[in-house]
């Protein structure tokens, strides 16, 4: 559905590391290689329904599933996936309305799906709510953001686009702040930190990032969030209203076919 909603994006790739996780599991866990276990890990593309059905048919054919059964199950699965995404968006809009009605603030805790795992996020969402903020995920508000383009980075990764769109929503909503959860092991995420910071600071919003790999307990994270809360309170006390001070977009210079004949990029 992202392609339909954001046709201006050049492409929409998903993490190449995640696609290889099943093979990593199979090659490193003896339990899944035991003779009485069939470990299936077909490569599937959720953005291409016909391809998805073909791959599932190939993977499940030996188990007695018919094409009709797989087609019906696939249609129901895709419908439920859209319901799930819409539920998240609806909840995000519900929380934003609640913030206005109760004069409260929220933090968009922008992280990858695996950051939802309490073993990975170390309880950061609960800690933030204990300090008086509501917590929103980036995919609960990204659909409300209208990111201006071109931006400095190549916008081709599915999660990165959600991140930039959610930042675009934060800069236009005075009740929202953003904290980015970043894992050192994800090299692709390294480019997002500077870009998100540029988007936020273009409208005088405070950028905060928490490096998950460096957080062994909540002490450091709590200090960072308390500092953010204090900065927000100081701004409120001084009647400071963030506004646009710069553009986060660029005028991208395109390297044309004609220029290839006369120029060399070093």
At which residue positions do the language-model features occur?
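Short glycine/threonine-rich loop-to-helix capping motif typified by GTGT followed
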Residues: 116-123, 148-157, 192-194
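Short connector loops at secondary-structure junctions
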Residues: 41-49, 133-155, 212-220
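Glycine-rich, anion-gripping cofactor-binding loops and their flanking helix/strand elements
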Residues: 6, 142-188
